[in-house]
Each structure stands twice: as C-alpha cells, then as structure tokens.
C-alpha cells in the first residue's frame, strides 16, 4: 500500500486524502494502443469527529465508513473535495499505471479468495479486509520504512512538494 501511495503522491502530486479516496472507477487505463492513462480526483477520505459529520447534515459526504474502534468519537468519511478546483483529471505516467494495474490484479485475487469476508468499497488503497486505510496508518508505514532504511525523516506530504518541484525543474 505504501509503494502505491508514494507513487501516486510523487507522480501525480496528490494529497494523502485524495489518494485514500480514490476508487477504481476513478482510474482510467489506456486502451487500444492509446498511451494516456489518467485518474479523476473527485473524492477525499478523511477522519472526522462523528458529531462534526452529523452537524454537516451529510452535505458533501459521500460515505461514512463503519467504525473499527469501539467507542471511538471519530469516523472515516469519503467526501467531495473542499473546492471545485480540487476536482481534476490527472494523467498517469505509464510506470504508475502499470503499478496500479498490478495492484488491482492482486486486489481482485484477494477479493476472490476472501469472498463475502472482503468489505468491498471499491477503494484503490484498501487493507486486506477491504477496509479503508486512514492517513495515520500510511504515515506509520512511511516512518517504519524510513527508519528501516536509515533515510532522512520526511513527511508524506513532502512527496507532493517534491513532485511539484521536480515538474517545474
């Protein structure tokens, strides 16, 4: 999951919530020799206070995921982005499209294996159970990777900044 998330952050300059909010219907692979794969950013996944989610009366909330922590005051939600400008089409480099194709194949095999035990929300980045990742889980995976490989400490969001800098150079 971290490998896919890092590739999307760097290749497509996506925010963590945009990455976690991607569903497979947002991904469009090149067909018939066309070399243009792309994705549609139209949702974001974030963790919010349950009371705050209720207070919005469902405005812009597309889905509230079942809580995995008993007595938690927080919920993961899939919602529309804050602004209309955040909704956009992003072209996928071939290498990133290939990574996503391989990831999708593995995910479909897992869905086949687990059957009804897989909670299928059609998320691109889903845990082995089908449940969504939250940003804290991705941050933790990144920190573990950084420390295991003795790399400089960076934030996940810095991948987005590096991506933009690289594209401007």
Model-derived features: where do they sit?
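Basic, Lys/Arg- and aromatic-enriched nucleic-acid-binding interface segment
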Residues: 1-16, 20-22, 32-36, 49, ...
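Short, basic (Lys/Arg/His-rich) helix/loop patches that form interaction surfaces
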Residues: 1-2, 12, 90, 105-169
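A cross-family signal for key residues in well-ordered alpha-helices
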Residues: 7, 101, 166
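Short, flexible loop/turn elements at secondary-structure junctions
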Residues: 10-12, 45, 96, 129
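A generic "binding-loop/recognition-motif" signal
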Residues: 15, 96, 160
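Flexible loop/turn segments at secondary-structure boundaries
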Residues: 15, 48-49, 99, 133, ...
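Conserved tyrosine-mediated DNA breakage-rejoining catalytic core shared by Y-recombinases
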Residues: 22-109
């Amino acid at each position: 999951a971290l490998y896919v998330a890092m590739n999307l952050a760097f290749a497509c300059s996506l925010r963590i919530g945009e990455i976690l909010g991607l569903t497979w219907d947002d991904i469009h692979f090149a067909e018939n020799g066309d070399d243009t794969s792309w994705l549609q950013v139209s949702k974001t996944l974030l963790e919010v206070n349950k009371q705050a989610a209720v207070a919005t009366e469902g405005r812009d909330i597309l889905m509230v995921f079942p809580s995995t922590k008993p007595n938690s005051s927080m919920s993961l939600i899939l919602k529309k982005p804050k602004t209309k400008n955040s909704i956009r089409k992003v072209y996928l480099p071939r290498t990133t499209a290939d990574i996503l194709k391989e990831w999708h194949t593995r995910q479909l095999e897992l869905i086949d294996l687990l059957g009804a035990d897989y909670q299928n929300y059609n998320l691109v980045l889903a845990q082995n159970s089908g449940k969504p990742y939250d940003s804290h889980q991705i941050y933790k995976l990144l920190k573990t990777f950084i420390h295991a490989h003795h790399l400089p400490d960076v934030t996940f969001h810095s991948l987005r900044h590096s991506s933009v800098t690289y594209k401007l150079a």
